[in-house]
Each structure stands twice: as C-alpha cells, then as structure tokens.
Amino acid sequence: MKRTYQPSNLVRKRRHGFRSRLATVGGRRVLANRRAKGRKRLSA
C-alpha cells in the first residue's frame, strides 16, 4: 500500500510556499494571522 505522504520539495514550495500564499486572498489571510501571532516562519 502506498503511503499518503511522499515528500517533494518542489510540490511543497508550490502548494505551501510564500508566493502561493500571496497569490490568493485566503493565503494572504493566513500570512496575516501568522504575522499577528508572531510566527518565526510564515510559510514553507
């Protein structure tokens, strides 16, 4: 049986990266929330 998590840095960056977050309204909201909380890392 194939497992659900097959790590790939390219896919990781494309799906959860900073620029993909900025591309959508929801992603911008995520970044704003993480900034407000004081997260050291905003995105992958």
Curated annotation (Swiss-Prot):
Region (Disordered): 1-21
Protein name: Large ribosomal subunit protein bL34
Family as reported in the entry's similarity comment: Belongs to the bacterial ribosomal protein bL34 family.
Underlying gene: rpmH
NCBIfam families assigned to the protein according to its UniProt record, in alphabetical order: rpmH_bact (TIGR01030)
Gene Ontology, cellular component aspect: ribonucleoprotein complex; ribosome
Keyword Chloroplast annotated: no
Keywords: Ribonucleoprotein, Ribosomal protein
Organism the protein comes from: Rhodospirillum rubrum (strain ATCC 11170 / ATH 1.1.1 / DSM 467 / LMG 4362 / NCIMB 8255 / S1)
